[in-house]
From Swiss-Prot:
CDD domains: PG-PI_TP. It holds the Pfam family E1_DerP2_DerF2. GO terms for molecular function: phosphatidylcholine binding; phosphatidylinositol binding; phosphatidylserine binding; sterol binding. It comes from the Eukaryota. The keyword Transport applies. GO terms for biological process: intracellular sterol transport. Belongs to the NPC2 family. Gene3D superfamilies: 2.60.40.770. SMART domains: ML. The gene is NPC2. This is Phosphatidylglycerol/phosphatidylinositol transfer protein. Keywords: Lipid transport, Signal, Transport. It comes from Pyricularia oryzae (strain 70-15 / ATCC MYA-4617 / FGSC 8958) (Rice blast fungus).
Length: 178
């Protein structure tokens, strides 16, 4: 569960991260046109985002890319154009390579408590700074995170995606690194 919390934190300013496959799906962006400014792997999904309730302006991760067993510091900012209330939800999917690890619909207001926010979220500027300890046991490989975030009335809050590659940590021994 700590692992999914880390991914939710990673995608926190967008209140997550991209799109769950399903109805009304918009293809994930394949180029940098939808990259969110800053030092992170976050991108907006393809499509029109002019009506999104959350306008993400910047996300920085340190370290980027994240490293298993280390603290991940997330600095994110954005603008909320409409109050976000209880009942908002996130469709979240996390894949490890081709294997789906998480495929769930979660209560947004419950999830954002992991990044020290709570509902309702009022209109205006939103800044988040959060440190998350990533478990050392994260297997090396490529993780793809998709999230689609909606209000209780099914209005789009945001649609984000991220691809994160965790590298194998080497172990120092007297005979060399393993």
């Amino acid at each position: 569960m700590r692992f999914s919390t880390a991914f939710l934190a990673l995608l926190s300013v967008g209140f997550s991260s991209a799109r769950l496959q399903g109805r009304d799906q918009v293809p994930v962006a394949l180029d940098d046109d939808h990259k969110i400014p800053g030092e992170s792997p976050l991108k907006l999904c393809d499509g029109d985002h002019k009506d999104d309730i959350l306008k993400i302006t910047k996300v920085d991760l340190s370290p980027n890319p994240p490293k298993a067993g280390e603290s991940l510091v997330i600095k994110a900012s954005g603008d909320v154009t409409q109050k976000i209330e209880e009942g908002a939800y996130i469709n979240l999917s996390v894949k490890y390579g081709l294997i789906r690890l998480i495929n769930t619909k979660a209560d947004l207001c419950e999830q954002i408590k992991n990044v020290d926010l709570e509902c309702p979220i009022d209109e205006g500027k939103l800044d988040i700074v959060k440190s998350v300890d990533l478990p050392n046991e994260i297997p090396p490989g490529k993780y793809t995170v998709f999230a689609d975030v909606y209000t209780k009335d099914n209005k789009k809050i945001s649609c984000l995606t991220a691809e994160v590659r965790f590298e194998r940590n080497s172990i120092a021994t007297p005979w060399g690194d393993l």
